[in-house]
């Protein structure tokens, strides 16, 4: 659903839209080091590393399945052709994904020193961490040096109509954009104006770390 119109798209399309948002944010911020929290199979990280080979990328994933799949893919010599189709633009180095620092770990206890990354981001990951959301955000604020970028279904954009009924009925993610400053993350930009699911909206939020 976007701009008042219903659109028919696959999960493939949703991944590409969210990936394009990440690409544009990295182009804007020009970070030298990036961490994804809750990286799953590592698709976003893998494509970003190949597009921006000069950036040091790292990812943390809690599940055995996600971490194992990401590491198995990383052991290949080159990026598989079927993954290249996810990329919305050219890849500068199809082998750069082999340098990603993938780690299995908990977002509520990140295995990195304070201020280790210029940018920390999450994509539909905080929504799965409601019980540890506060600790995860505190850890994100601790390890980022400059910014946090989240594409998450914050309550702020799910407070009306079907979205409100959906999240309240499932007792889903309670976090709000307005909560971020309590962790030292001050929102600079927020938008839900991009194609996405009808019943659960995500919002792309950029926040700056301030002490």
Go through each PLM region and give its residues.
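A conserved beta-strand element that flanks and buttresses the S-adenosyl-L-methionine
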Residues: 121
């Amino acid at each position: 659903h976007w701009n008042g119109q219903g659109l028919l798209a696959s999960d493939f399309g949703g991944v590409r839209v969210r990936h394009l948002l990440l690409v544009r944010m990295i182009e804007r911020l020009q970070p030298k080091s990036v961490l994804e929290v809750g990286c799953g199979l590592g698709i976003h990280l893998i494509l970003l590393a190949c597009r921006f080979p000069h950036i040091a990328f790292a990812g943390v994933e809690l599940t055995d399945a996600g971490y194992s799949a990401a590491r198995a893919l990383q052991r290949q010599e080159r990026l598989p052709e079927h993954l290249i189709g996810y990329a919305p633009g050219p890849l500068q180095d199809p082998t750069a994904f082999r340098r990603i620092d993938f780690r299995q770990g908990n977002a509520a206890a990140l295995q990195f020193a304070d201020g280790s990354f210029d940018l920390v981001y999450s994509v539909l990951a905080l929504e799965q961490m409601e019980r540890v959301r506060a600790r995860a955000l505190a850890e994100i604020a601790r390890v980022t040096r400059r910014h946090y970028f989240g594409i998450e279904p914050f309550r702020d954009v799910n407070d009306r109509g079907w979205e409100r009924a959906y999240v309240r009925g499932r007792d889903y993610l309670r976090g709000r954009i307005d909560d971020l400053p309590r962790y030292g993350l001050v929102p600079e930009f927020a938008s839900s104006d991009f194609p996405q699911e009808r019943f659960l909206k995500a919002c792309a939020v950029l926040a700056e770390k301030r002490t």
